[in-house]
Each structure stands twice: as structure tokens, then as C-alpha cells.
Amino acid sequence: MADRSDIIIENYQVSPRIGFLPDKPPLARLPHPYYAGWEETISRVAPSRGDGRAREYIDEMPLLSTGKLRVLPEWHRAYTLLSILSQVYIWDGDEPSNRIPASIASPLLAVSEHLGLNPCASFASFCLWNIRPVGRHGLNYAAAYEPENLGQITSFTGTTDEEWFFSISAAIEARGGCLIPGMFDTIEAAREGNSQRVQEFLGTLASCVRHMCKDLKRMYEGCAPSVFYHDVRPFLNGGKGVNKDTQTPGGVFYENESGGGQWHQYQGGSNAQSSLIQLLDIFLGVDHSITAANKPHEGYHREMQSYMPGKHRQFLQLMSRLSNVREFVLCHPVTAEIRIEYSRATAELVALRQTHMIMASRYIVMQGRKGSMCRDSSKGTGGTEFMPFLKDARDCTLATCCPRP
């Protein structure tokens, strides 16, 4: 088993201050003039969304290589830009497109391979690498990542509702990200049999998740359910279900420069792709196969890791090997304070998931009942039946709490 001193979390592109968000704000524009065509296209597409010209502009975009991308933030910007363009191309029209041109598909495939995630829009392109602090906060990360101090770089709709939606997600990521160094210290404390240190951190974790839940509840301040449902949500859908009722294989055809290509089926962007939430599960020992009802969804949690940046996925795999906190806690008597503190921490994660369920109902289910929408409102943007999935994730977390004496 790896020793904590051998692990440098920055090697996994994880910040000790804000977790899976990049330590330095994402680029707002690719610096090399070679990529001006990409940046100009995205700036033309956003205002023209809905008038039928977005695909026309993208079809005019030059086919560029990734050879002039140098540093990691440039790769992040390229992935964000290309994946958003792919979403606009698929969904901005009366009917979804079942193809994306080589000018998007070819570099998107290359960039995604470099970053180790699927070549489609994801939580990383919507949130991690597309939200940045605005204003001057120096090294005060807590202030910089309050939702009101965040701004969106590239938008689908140009609405403040969309910006607020993703700013809330980024604020939650930053809030929980600062727990990561303490997780390593707590795993080491459990190895050493230091119950007091483990108990203290569980209290810290519970408080942090409670604040994450408060951040989530702020969604209502700046994102109207109707705007999210009708304007933002359609662009978060995946291409997996496109053409599923025709003679084609289904999904989206990624064209290449020689005129050929390949069919791909990918889910849409979803908070289930948050590495932070899966990390909390891993650290606390939440087992998503613990209930019979959740069996069909167990694989979905694993599938969502393929939509995470490769280094983040490797980090979760590392933490899965190291995690020992639940096992350590259960070695204590039923009445021990450490078991009570563990259950409190787990209960806060249950509350976060319950809040998410309520919000999903208000923003999607209730909006779907108010009017018709051609796309299935029972499915989340990640492509699964989302209410049963959210309920089962909550129930598995609840089942993780220590039995009461």
C-alpha cells in the first residue's frame, strides 16, 4: 500500500485547495493565433443559437490539428470549446443532427485522447474548465469560489441562469475540494489506530458537506426552473439516443478528414460525472450495490468515470485502494463516539442527495408536467432514468450509516 509521503496529489491534476478544479483559472481564449478560427466560430455561434445559422457557421470552421497546443490549460480550453461546439451542432435545430463534421470531430477525438476522457461534452467542459473567478481575491480561494464571484467563459444560451447553474456546481467543487489533504491524513490516522484524529476529521467533513448542501440550495437565487428546462437542459443531452429508432447504429457519426468516420454513443453532461461526489462515496465507503433496487445503477456510477479527466479517474482508483475509514470505524463499539460522528458525516451526504432529488424534481419533472417537450423529461442529461437513480444513490448512502445501538 502506498505511503502518503509518496503521493503528490498535483500529479493527478488535483488541487489541495480546490480539489478537481484547476488551481489556476481556465483560459478564456487559446493564445496561439492558429486557433483563431475555433475561437471566432464559438463567438459567432452563441448569438446565433436558435436562428438556424449555428450549424452553417460550424460547417465553415477550418479543420485544425492539435499540434500547437502546448500546456495543460490550452488542452482544457480546446476540449471545452470543441465539445461545446459539438453539442450546439447536434442540438441547435428543429431536429438533432446525427453527425458532426470533421472540423470538430477530428480534433475533439485527439484532445479527448490526450486528456483521457470521452470525446463529448461533460461535467469537465461545462463546469471544471469553463468557470473562473471574476474580480481580485488573491489567494483567498474561499471568497473567489463563492457563486457570486464566478463567471462562465463560454455559454450555450447567454443567460445568467445558465451561468449561475454552473457557478453553483463549481462552488460546490471548490468547497469540498479542500477536504482532500485531510482525507489522506485521516486514512493514515486509521492505519495508526488514532481514533481521535479520524473522529475529528469526520466532524470537519460533515460540516463541509453541510455547507455544500447550502451552496446547492442557492441554485434558486439565480437559475429559474423554466429557463433551465427549456433553454439550458437541451444542450446538455448526450448523443446516445439520437437516431435510435432508425436503421443507423444510433448515436452520432464523427466524420473524419478523408470522408469516413465512426458512430459514437455517449451520455450527456451530468453531475454524476463529478469526481468529488464519487470521492466522498469512496472515502466514506458508500456501496452502490448495497440495495437490490440499485443493482442496475451500480454500473452507471462506474461508467460515469469514463467521462472524467483521466488523471481524476486515476485518483479515484488510488483512493479506492487506500480507503479504510469505514472498516476502521466499524471496529469500534456500537456506542463509540467515532461511529456516531461517522454516521453524522454520512447523513450529511444523504441530505445533499435528498436536496439534489428535490431540485431535480422542481427543475425537470415539474417543468415537464407544465408543457410538452419532445425529449424525454424522465431521463437525466446523463441518459439514465434520473429519479430512480438519485433515489437509489440516496438510499445506498443512508444504508452506509452505522447501526444505532
From Swiss-Prot:
Intrachain disulfide bonds: none
Family to which this protein belongs: Belongs to the indoleamine 2,3-dioxygenase family.
GO terms, molecular function: heme binding; indoleamine 2,3-dioxygenase activity; metal ion binding
Keywords: Dioxygenase, Iron, Metal-binding, Oxidoreductase
TM region positions: none
InterPro entries, A to Z: Indolamine_dOase (IPR000898), Trp/Indoleamine_2_3_dOase-like (IPR037217)
Gene3D superfamilies reported for this sequence: 1.20.58.480
Gene Ontology biological process terms from the UniProt entry: 'de novo' NAD biosynthetic process from L-tryptophan; L-tryptophan catabolic process to kynurenine
Binding residues for heme: H312
Record EC number: 1.13.11.52
GO CC terms of this entry: cytoplasm
Upper taxonomic lineage: Eukaryota, Fungi, Dikarya, Ascomycota, Pezizomycotina
SUPFAM superfamilies named in the record: Indolic compounds 2,3-dioxygenase-like
Function text: Indoleamine 2,3-dioxygenase; part of the gene cluster that mediates the biosynthesis of aspcandine, a pyrrolobenzazepine alkaloid. Initially, the indoleamine 2,3-dioxygenase acdA accepts L-tryptophan and performs the oxidative opening of the indole ring to yield N'-formyl-L-kynurenine, which undergoes the spontaneous deformylation reaction to provide L-kynurenine. The kynurenine 3-monooxygenase acdD then hydroxylates L-kynurenine to afford 3-hydroxy-L-kynurenine. 3-hydroxy-L-kynurenine is activated by the A domain of the NRPS-PKS acdB and subsequently loaded onto the enzyme.
Pfam families per UniProt: IDO
Protein name per UniProt: Indoleamine 2,3-dioxygenase acdA
Origin species: Aspergillus candidus
Cofactor: heme
PANTHER family to which the protein is assigned, alphabetical: INDOLEAMINE 2,3-DIOXYGENASE
Note on cofactor: Binds 1 heme group per subunit.
